[in-house]
């Protein structure tokens, strides 16, 4: 490469925003880029990553940084043998084991037990390796599992740290373990209290002699009782064990508990880790100080070169039974012997010992102590005594004891080590595979709220910067030490919390695994902490709150998609978080943004100082446009965003439907809702009185009251209080349906009840006038006043002023109920405005009263209302799933709500019909994730798994009324490995229900299959021919049969047997059709005369290939044509020949001619083959005649039901039959009309056809009134179903028939809606054979995906 190409100007950098998934160092400033904030830019030429601010400086100041182009790819191969080097490089940066990392971890000692002991003993509260080490692209599964267990098991499973050692330890170490095991005994608690009292008395009386008194007290009470030996092996604390001992390759480290923490002279912020240089300096200072004070004797033997390496860090130790500091008087004669015994590689050396004291000195010694600290902070240090601060942290076991089990803090440090390692892995696809296990993900997510609760329990205090106050007053000393310890615990916990939420945040980058995050409590845990974020102000960083906000945005993104909508809707606190986020950031995340050009404003309907309402047109619909002015009185963006978010989150048939809002770059925002032309309730009822001269009918008022009560019941179920229930906030549309509006003053129920007086005085409850806290019963009181208005058409308190009205209501006064109101309604109104709030009924109870008025108990117990029958029968529920995309769902009707409820129950509850629903959804997402890891070449050769396609339902999509794109796309087939051993059709799932659906395997027709004896060739050709014309199918079938006859005579003999069986099968099919006609159940919407492709799908569904004959036949009515898996040859031959026989129903003469021609060809080849083929033809003729008789019976009974389109199809068939003659004289199959890829019709794919037609089918539906109403359904090429009660064809391009599925690049076209029918078979595989008799009158037309 030339030099001028190497040195390119800075303008050649192509900076683009980059989302960090690992720790990165900026190329310019060489500082760490925080992965949480995502403030990074990447140059796609040189692949270097910079801070955003550094990129701006490069561009503005025109800094000439060299862009070397794409870097060379260096392939790094990691092996299991390199993992010890990984741990060694990670922890060699630690200040604790600078000189001992080589001895601890190597290839010989790399075991999980060694890592467990090593990592547990480590203390890295504030270590340097956090900024130095890199991220790792290797993670062995065994090590990953161990680290996860190290993080979670001590909090999720075990209350304390318990380590099992493989071999016996040293005797002195066992004694130390005995001290820790007996730490919580009651006897030692009493000893601790006695020692505390003795220390207080001794400190007050003899301050100058306290050092000697403490030594005597310890020697008499602690050392003698516990046989504590003074040797070097006692230095077993996590902070000093590696500084005191040199471990051999097979040495075992003891996990002992250190319960007294030395004051760090080097750094006030780090009192838990010690470096080698700090240890040497401190040891020399202690030696000088001990010689100066003459507190201990020391040997004069010179120290060797390794004495600093093996010298003892003279920290004082204390078990949890002692409250005072423990002074270690170490004998010189025992030090070298024990050191040599424990460390074989160490040389004999003498160690100078010191006595560490805890003193409370006089003012004179205070000044001296202050002078020492002054010099310690300078460059030249003078010897000084070490002040040991006693640990006084509240114990989780016994808070009153003021003691602290160091296992908690020790455990947190262990967690931090594991979290640091986990935080440093590259969160790429290779490493994320380990997180697909819910066994690890769920406990890791649950751990975060546990750590947050501990963080909240810690009370922060000011740091103790003045040591003089500690020495003057013992009580102040204890409290300040408590604050210091709390601050230390808070610092340690805050690091763990930040690491853990950063790990969870990186997982959320993989949106393919979103279903997994809803299941394994990742989203639930973060949302739970976010709901209590006010109490965490000051304890969590800004980056952590940004991660919580990201989860809220994720909930808003998936709110309109099923099944997430049902999951989110069941959590009112999640909806509350979405609303609070919209209010806080002044942004709407649930509504659809509408521009001003998309709406057409017509006339003004209503005007007030707050807003102006216009009637208009949006997307071809009559809508109401509620416009605000930013300069208007009382306008507030916070209230505006709150209203549109609550309306978007509260979509219900009885709540005003919101189509979107205009909020960006405008001074006059507006909200687009459905138009209610009749105005408010009072206006609509008064209009009846004016036009008819009579009061409104009571049944009409009851129906309107039911609508109003249903809307309030819905918002109360979401923990919303409307707070302004009045007649003007209920609008009536053209169909006399009541809709609830005006959520501007609504709010979600919080932990504390509200005291703010909000509402209209005429409707306000008495507790609001009294200033008492109010809850949802306040809306019930207001609704009682609305009922009084509806049944009296009058205004309450019209003769009273506001003050008189308030006093009247507080004293128990209510409006008078006239006798014209029915008694039941009058009693209901009186119960709604009872003075005591908790005695008022709920809206569920109110609705029961109204329902009893409309639908009294029937005399005959078998006469059940149609709604009850509809939603209590699992079979009918499955049938309704076929119509998921009709206008009923678009309008959010009762069926939609119930269906979504059933879907939610199938996800969240254990039911037999939905037992594997969510599990299969998880498998789909995991399979998609693993499939994306494959290279393009590997994907082509991959036969085990493929990428599922995202498909979700949008029941409440803001733009659900927009026009639908009817573009047919060819989709690749998917084959997902299913671990469940269920039925044969377990690979087909409801794509409209499952967000990640997969299709069945694709059958490819290759040239090598032409001469194959397998019957699959017949099946393939038959299926492919369905998309073109039927006569060519017969030719291809006959040609293929000729090939088989020429190859093998036995093949023809088997076909003869199968054809004989087909005679009985077709006879059964004809009888079954006759029975269906007698029962007035239209098996096919065309009156029995159907095209060949539809009769194919029908006959294949009704094939009695196994013992579940009735189940299979019923499945043919409920589901589309399905390509079953290839079983044994006999079964396949039966099904294929049966299809061939049914294809002959329309054109028997042509089929016979084709058969004769093919037989002539066979005679020229082989006489034996000719005989076999003649037998085949004879059997086929018999079968065809039998089928012709059956079809004649059907056609004679249904001649009047033939539609215009069917007549055209018949004429077209006749034309095709006349023009279709066998042109292929050879024995090769005719493949001109055979498609290359045959897609399973169970999935949302459509077969391309030469002509586009619109067919109409008549479906009989029982409406509960005792009559059968015929609904006309129209299905166009895009699979759009529309209904029209007038039995007239309407425009297929009209907007009112559009589907509610949002189109995007990642979501494929759904195809025919009836493809949802595979759900029936997966949900209820064993349907009762008598179901058609039970659901008389409920017959639904089957629409095949291949039609």
Curated annotation (Swiss-Prot):
Source taxon at top rank: Eukaryota
Kindly name one Pfam family recorded for this protein.
PK_Tyr_Ser-Thr
| GO cellular component terms listed in the entry, alphabetical order | cytoplasm; lysosome; plasma membrane
What keywords does the record list, in alphabetical order? ATP-binding, Kinase, Metal-binding, Nucleotide-binding, Serine/threonine-protein kinase, Transferase, Zinc, Zinc-finger
MF terms in GO: ATP binding; protein kinase activity; protein serine kinase activity; protein serine/threonine kinase activity; zinc ion binding
**Binding-site list for ATP:** 605-613, 626
User: Which leading EC class covers this enzyme?
Assistant: transferase
Specify residue ranges for compositional bias: Polar residues.
271-282, 1063-1083, 1118-1127
What segments bear the compositional bias annotation Basic residues?
Answer: 366-382, 389-402
* Disulfide-bonded cysteines: none
The region called Disordered is annotated at: 262-316, 333-402, 463-485, 937-1241, 1282-1310
Catalytic center residues = 724 (proton acceptor)
| Acidic residues bias (residue ranges) | 976-986
Return the InterPro entries for the record: C1-like_sf (IPR046349), Kinase-like_dom_sf (IPR011009), PE/DAG-bd (IPR002219), Prot_kinase_dom (IPR000719), Ser-Thr/Tyr_kinase_cat_dom (IPR001245), Ser/Thr_kinase_AS (IPR008271), Ser/Thr_Kinases-Pseudokinases (IPR051681)
- Domain (Protein kinase) ranges: 599-854
Biased composition range(s): Low complexity: 286-316, 333-342, 350-361, 464-485, 1004-1015, 1024-1062, 1128-1241, 1282-1291
Q: Which CDD domains match?
A: C1_PIK3R-like_rpt1
> What ranges of residues constitute the Phorbol-ester/DAG-type zinc fingers?
12-67
Task: Return one Gene Ontology term, BP aspect.
Answer: signal transduction
Please write the reaction equations for the catalytic activity of this protein: L-seryl-[protein] + ATP = O-phospho-L-seryl-[protein] + ADP + H(+); L-threonyl-[protein] + ATP = O-phospho-L-threonyl-[protein] + ADP + H(+)
What's the family?
A: Belongs to the protein kinase superfamily. TKL Ser/Thr protein kinase family.
The protein's name in its UniProt record: Probable serine/threonine-protein kinase DDB_G0288147
Which species is the source of this protein?
Dictyostelium discoideum (Social amoeba)
